[in-house]
């Protein structure tokens, strides 16, 4: 039944996260969105919880509160930040903040959700990483902490497969209409045409492109796919991208 499908999405208030929430709602899920700010969407079936996921203690508390209220069996950790800096300017605080956001939050949320997933012998976990794990200048803390998601997914896939739980990664390339992309490349930037020309499919991605990949991984029919990384990047993972 529709009411029995519960998903948690981090960073669900805008961009890729909002597109993922919309897709899940259309598929009949009750969706809990964890974000720093509310979307204001007011969609039926959407439950919004405001939390700073870079705050490890607040994240753990929010995770346990959500899991006590909702039987979450689908978890999508999408929230992220970049902190673009050359190597000389990267601080340990930058590294710790993005480690908390990208990796510690994933761990806290997964540990909180695991009892329900194991009890139901079903779970779908998607970690939203980035094409930048293959290397991109001035992304030291972003690339390294997002790359850690691939290690989490492969390890958890081995540990949890016998419990009916799959864990996969979606790694987007340049996605328009997202704060993270346009923080680096404004919509009126003269660099934009050059970036598009460097993408094999000759366009930027859209949030819906990523949501469709997530939709595949969370399907009950995807139970034989786990520990995998799907690049949703217009082909830049097999070539390069110019910023």
Give short role names for the model-derived ranges.
Residues 215, 226-243:
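Short C-terminal tail/terminal secondary-structure segment
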Residues 13-14:
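Conserved glycine-rich cofactor-binding loop
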Residues 86-87, 94-99, 191, 195:
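Substrate-binding pocket helix/loop in short-chain dehydrogenase/reductase
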Residues 78-84, 235:
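Conserved NAD(P)H cofactor-binding loop of Rossmann-fold oxidoreductase domains
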Residues 115, 158-162, 223:
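Alpha-helical segment proximal to the catalytic Tyr-Lys
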Residues 126-148, 153-162, 174:
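Catalytic loop of short-chain dehydrogenase/reductase
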Residues 44, 162, 175-199, 239-243:
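A glycine/serine/threonine-rich, flexible loop-to-helix segment
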């Amino acid at each position: 039944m529709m009411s029995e499908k519960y998903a948690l999405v981090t960073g669900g208030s805008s961009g890729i996260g909002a597109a993922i929430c919309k897709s899940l709602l259309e598929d009949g899920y009750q969706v809990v969105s964890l974000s720093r700010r509310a979307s204001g969407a007011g969609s039926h079936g959407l439950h919004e919880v405001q939390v700073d996921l870079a705050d490890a203690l607040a994240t753990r508390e929010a995770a346990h509160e959500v899991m006590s209220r909702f039987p979450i069996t689908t978890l999508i950790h999408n929230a992220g930040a970049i902190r673009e800096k050359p190597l000389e300017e990267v601080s340990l605080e930058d590294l710790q903040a993005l480690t908390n956001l990208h990796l510690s939050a994933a761990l806290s949320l997964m540990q909180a959700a695991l009892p329900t997933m194991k009890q139901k012998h079903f779970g779908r976990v998607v970690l939203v990483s980035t094409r930048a794990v293959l290397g991109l200048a001035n992304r030291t803390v972003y690339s390294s902490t997002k790359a850690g998601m691939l290690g989490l997914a492969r390890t958890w896939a081995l540990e949890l497969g016998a419990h009916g739980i799959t864990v996969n990664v979606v790694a987007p390339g340049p996605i328009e209409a997202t704060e993270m992309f346009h923080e680096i490349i404004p919509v009126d930037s003269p660099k934009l045409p050059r970036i598009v020309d460097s993408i094999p499919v000759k366009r930027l991605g859209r949030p819906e492109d990523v949501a469709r990949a997530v939709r595949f991984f969370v399907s009950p029919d995807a139970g034989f796919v786990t520990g995998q990384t799907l690049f949703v990047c217009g082909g830049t993972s097999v070539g390069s991208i110019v910023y």
